[in-house]
Amino acid sequence: MTTTLANRPDGEGSVQVKLDPKVNIEEGALVIAVYGKGGIGKSTTSSNLSAAFSKLGKKVLQIGCDPKHDSTFTLTHKMVPTVIDILEEVDFHSEELRPQDFMFEGFNGVQCVESGGPPAGTGCGGYVTGQTVKLLKEHHLLEDTDVVIFDVLGDVVCGGFAAPLQHANYCLIVTANDFDSIFAMNRIVAAINAKAKNYKVRLGGVIANRSAELDQIEKFNEKTGLKTMAHFRNVDAIRRSRLKKCTIFEMDPEEEGVLEVQNEYLSLAKKMIDNVEPLEAEPLKDREIFDLLGFD
C-alpha cells in the first residue's frame, strides 16, 4: 500500500493509507466501525452489540483492531492470539494458515478475530487491519457473514487506524456526557467526513455510555447534526460482566439493571438492521466546542 500527497485520496490534505480494492468486504454484509475516546468502553459496547445481533439471528464477525487484543475476550472468555502474531509464526505465508488458527467462536456463535498490531512506535495499524481483511477473504470467511463489527483503538484517526472506515457502512461513536469524550468525538466526525468523500462509510450515530444524563451530548448533537442511538447508564452489572469475562447477555437478568441494558443493546441492533438513516454532521471548531459545553 502506498500513498501520496498529490492524489489526496481520502479528503483534502489526506495522507491516509488507500484501500486496496481487492480487500473490499462483500456487498450485503452490514459493516460497522466503532470509535470513541480511549477507555470510553468501545470493546464492551462492540462485544455486547455483537451478542445482540447474534440474538437476533445474525451471523456476526467482530474484528478487534487494537494491539492490546482485548476486544473479544468477553465473547470468547479468553485472550485469543492475534492475526499479526500468527502470521509472524509462518513468516507471513498466509497460505499455510487454517481458519481456526486466527478465528475463534464466541458467545452464541459470534466469530472473533484480533488483528493485533505492531510494537509501539513501529509499523502501521492500518496495514495490519488490511491484512486481516485480506486473510479473511482468502479463506472465504466473509461470504456468509451478516454483520461485521470493527472495534477500533482509541480516538486515533490517523491513516492507519482510520482504515476500518474504508470498509464500513456506518460508524458509531461511543461517548460519555463529558467534555473530553465529546471533544474526541468531534475529531472522529471530521475523519469520517473526510473518508465519506471517497468511501461508502457514513455516520450512524452516537452511543452514550456510562452517563446518567445526556445534556452535553445533546447540545453537541444539536449543533453538529448527530443523533443518540442508544443510552447506557453507569450500571454496575456491565463492569462486573467484564470481570466475569462475559457479555451482558450472560449475566443474570434478575440482577439490577441487566435486563434494561440487554434490551437497549437489542434495540440498537434492530435499529442498525432496519437501515438506519445516515447522518450529515459537521464538526465544530475547537473553540466552538469549548464555548458550547458546560454550565452557564
Swiss-Prot record:
One of its GO terms (biological process) is light-independent chlorophyll biosynthetic process. Pathway: Porphyrin-containing compound metabolism; chlorophyll biosynthesis (light-independent). Pfam families: Fer4_NifH. [4Fe-4S] cluster binds at C124, C158. GO terms for molecular function: 4 iron, 4 sulfur cluster binding; ATP binding; metal ion binding; oxidoreductase activity, acting on iron-sulfur proteins as donors; oxidoreductase activity, acting on the CH-CH group of donors, iron-sulfur protein as acceptor. NCBIfam families: DPOR_bchL. Homodimer. Protochlorophyllide reductase is composed of three subunits; ChlL, ChlN and ChlB. PANTHER family: LIGHT-INDEPENDENT PROTOCHLOROPHYLLIDE REDUCTASE IRON-SULFUR ATP-BINDING PROTEIN (PTHR42864:SF2). This is Light-independent protochlorophyllide reductase iron-sulfur ATP-binding protein. It comes from Prochlorococcus marinus (strain SARG / CCMP1375 / SS120). The lineage of its organism: Bacteria, Bacillati, Cyanobacteriota, Cyanophyceae, Synechococcales.
